[in-house]
């Protein structure tokens, strides 16, 4: 599992992504070439990059080097900037649901 930043890594851990697997945090996509020596031995690279131009460029750079070993995991948090944004949105939605449940506004539906 490969992340652009440490907050995305921490968010992945909270969400249960990659339990029992190795993780590598770039801290900036500009550090990608420094990470190659750590990535070369892996059979699959699950990339959790930001949904922006820099994230897409980094993904394409990895695909050029590693081909089919590279998996784009950004679909998990589509509509959000990154994993941390997705986690914050998910937590806010759960909190709103719980508050509505207390007020009886969820029509008896439970999470």
Regions of interest found by a model, annotated:
Residues 1-4, 47:
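Conserved Lys-Pro-Asp/Glu-containing loop-to-beta segment of HAD-superfamily phosphomonoesterases
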